[in-house]
Amino acid sequence: MIFITGDTHGDWISRLRTESFPEQKEMTKDDYVIICGDFGIWDNSKREKYNLDWLEDKPFTTLFIDGNHENYDILDALPVKEWNGGKVHFIRPSVIHLMRGQVFTISDKTFFTFGGARSHDIRDGILEVGDPRIKEWSKDPFKLFRINHVSWWEREMPNVAEMDEGIQNLRKINNEVDFVITHCGPASTIALYSHGEFKPD
């Protein structure tokens, strides 16, 4: 079995507890929950580690791609391993980050993974640690800003190497997969289906 959700932002317990997700009673570690970005790797706090241990103890395997709200300093420091045909980071033995531009075979289906997205909650800018405006702006509920390497990472957007690797991996399988897992679709596609509501950056 495979279940897909998104944007857990580190709150795995409320989303994936048995009361919210009773299907897990029939699941094993050979069944999967895929989280489509904004998984919630954030600060290595005791609470986050506790929650990850809780997730590891669930009967299923958790897979996730990155979104625009992840701590890329933590993710990028992890060793790169191979799993089911593609590159991954193991957060726990059964909590696995599926890296960008990869093709995985999971439950006899092929999945192309490409995480990342551009943050839209940064209208007032990206500030550096120590910027005196942080204290003042933090009190203003209308200020939309982030702090570099604290609450925002440039790595939220894919780089050319990741895009090239994705193209190469897709070519190896004649550009055919069963599923594409992404945090945010291409701007051109979103614009097409939004009936004029979506305004690209």
How does the language model describe each region?
Residues 1-3:
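Extreme N-terminal starter segment of soluble prokaryotic enzymes
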Residues 5, 10-106, 199-200:
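Core catalytic region of metal-dependent phosphoesterases/phosphodiesterases
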Residues 109-196:
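Active-site-proximal loop/helix segment associated with metal-binding centers of metalloenzymes
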